[in-house]
A protein has these predicted regions:
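Residues within the DNA-recognition helix of helix-turn-helix
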Residues: 74
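N-terminal helix-turn-helix DNA-binding core of bacterial DNA-binding proteins
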Residues: 23-70, 81, 91, 97
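N-terminal leader segment of winged-helix/HTH proteins
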Residues: 1-37
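Alpha-helical linker/hinge and terminal dimerization helices associated
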Residues: 43, 81, 110-122
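Basic, amphipathic "hinge/linker" alpha-helix immediately C-terminal to the N-terminal HTH DNA-binding motif
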Residues: 90-113
Length: 122
């Protein structure tokens, strides 16, 4: 068997080929969203986008301490989950903005409820 044919698969103990798992393979959608939100900066990116669309540099200035690499990764994940959209204007210089999708606005309203719950006295 060619080595190249194994790309994207995993060999298990019995040497069977196992199909690659999809990027979002969680059986529980709550677990999937909790995992996404569990990454540092993700909730803050959502919060800042809840006030309106932002360019990459604007977001980075709103989040002191976040690196360009991490911010790009968080935005890519949020776009991949359909929570954020990326728009590019046909202008020079290129103007890219990020904004919440309808799904993202729904998620922010849930995060607002979680914040209200967290602020209640114990």
């Amino acid at each position: 068997m060619e080595t190249g044919s194994l790309q994207g698969t995993r060999i298990t103990r019995g040497f069977e080929r196992e199909r690659p798992t999809p990027r979002h393979a969680s059986a529980c959608p709550v677990e999937e969203i909790a995992a996404m939100l569990g990454h540092r900066w993700t909730a803050l990116v959502l919060w800042h986008l809840s006030t309106g669309s932002k360019r990459f540099g604007e977001l980075q200035r709103c989040l002191p301490g976040v690196t360009r690499k991490v911010l790009a990764e968080r935005l890519a994940t949020l776009i991949d989950h359909g929570v954020v959209t990326r728009s590019q204007a046909a202008s020079f210089p290129r103007q890219v903005t990020y904004q919440l999708s309808g799904r993202g606005r729904g998620l922010v309203s849930i995060l607002d409820q979680i914040e209200d719950w967290a602020r209640q006295p114990h």
